[in-house]
Structure formats: structure tokens, C-alpha cells
Amino acid sequence: MTAMLDSFATDLTAATSLHQPGNLPHPPHAIDAENVPLSGGTDPTYGEVRWRTLINGTEAAPRDMVLGIAEFGPGHQLRPHRHTPPEFYLGLEGSGIVTIDGVPHEIRAGVALYIPGDAEHGTVAGPEGLRFAYGFASASFEAIEYRFTASA
């Protein structure tokens, strides 16, 4: 699991530093998703999902939030799991079902879902696949402990 989490770290050298007024705790930056390599793939622990973590903190470049894009092929899934921080999803392309604490919710372009902290949730993509943005109020993706139901 640690090796998988290490793959979430994003090299921010491709990020563009934006003007920073002196009163901001962290410098703003912009990054193009196309410049961030995909992580993930197929794994019996987490399913068949790939992701690009676009905004992510490190010791050298701290952040207050994590933002990324998850990508699923047709019928692929992210297995049920939990983590302490709440999370949001915002559908970008395709469709699917996100089951949160046993209740299925449709996700598609323009649909936002709020997932409370420690709520069990998993995703199954529809026949055309699925892309959604995800985010956490966390200093880094690596600080988030994923607890998959099958290995809980």
C-alpha cells in the first residue's frame, strides 16, 4: 500500500508559479493535467482506476488541499473504501454509480457529490467510462490513509 501511495506524489516542477502577494501562506500555481502522468491501473486492492493528482502538497511546496482527476474505462471500478477527510467528486465525462454508505448515486458531467469523512464509498463506471475531479482539504494526498473494505 505504501508503494501505491508513493505513486500519488506529483512533481510540481511543471507547475507555473503565479504572482504571490506577501500575505499568502502558499504560492499559487497553475498546472495542465496533460503534463501530469497517470498513476494507478489495475490492482486487486483498489480496482481499475487511473488518476492524476494535480494539486498536492510536499514539505518543499505545502498546500491546503488536494485536487486530481480520476479516469475509469467502461465498467471499471474503484473498490469500496474509507478515509478520514471528506471528499468531493465533480463529474467531467461519462457516467457511473458512486455508492456512499450503501446508497447509490449517479455521477455524470456536471454532477457534484459530497462524501462525508469515514463514509464507505466505491465507484463503478458506466459503459462509456467515467472521468471526475476529486478533492480533499488535506496538506497532501500521501497524508490520506485509504482503508479498503476488503483489507479492513
Curated annotation (Swiss-Prot):
Matches recorded under InterPro entries: Cupin_2, RmlC-like_jellyroll, RmlC_Cupin_sf
Span of domain Cupin type-2: 69-124
Gene Ontology MF terms: dimethylpropiothetin dethiomethylase activity; metal ion binding
Signals that turn on the gene: Up-regulated by pre-growth of cells with dimethylsulfoniopropionate (DMSP).
Record-listed Fe cation binding positions: 83, 87, 89, 121
Listed result of changing residue 121 to A: Decreased iron binding and enzyme activity toward DMSP
Record's catalysed reaction(s): S,S-dimethyl-beta-propiothetin = acrylate + dimethyl sulfide + H(+)
UniProt keyword Iron, yes or no: yes
Substitution effect: residue 81 to A: Decreased iron binding and enzyme activity toward DMSP
Gene3D superfamilies with a match to the protein in the record: Jelly Rolls (2.60.120.10)
Cofactor field: Fe(2+)
Disruption phenotype: Decreased production of dimethyl sulfide (DMS).
EC number: 4.4.1.3
Influence of pH: Optimum pH is 8.0.
Comment on bound cofactor: Binds 1 Fe(2+) ion per subunit.
Keywords assigned: Iron, Lyase, Metal-binding
Biological function: Able to cleave dimethylsulfoniopropionate (DMSP), releasing dimethyl sulfide (DMS) and acrylate. DMS is the principal form by which sulfur is transported from oceans to the atmosphere.
Description of how the protein assembles with itself and partners: Homodimer.
Family (UniProt): Belongs to the non-heme iron-dependent dioxygenase family.
Protein name, entry field: Dimethylsulfoniopropionate lyase DddW
Organism: Ruegeria pomeroyi (strain ATCC 700808 / DSM 15171 / DSS-3) (Silicibacter pomeroyi)
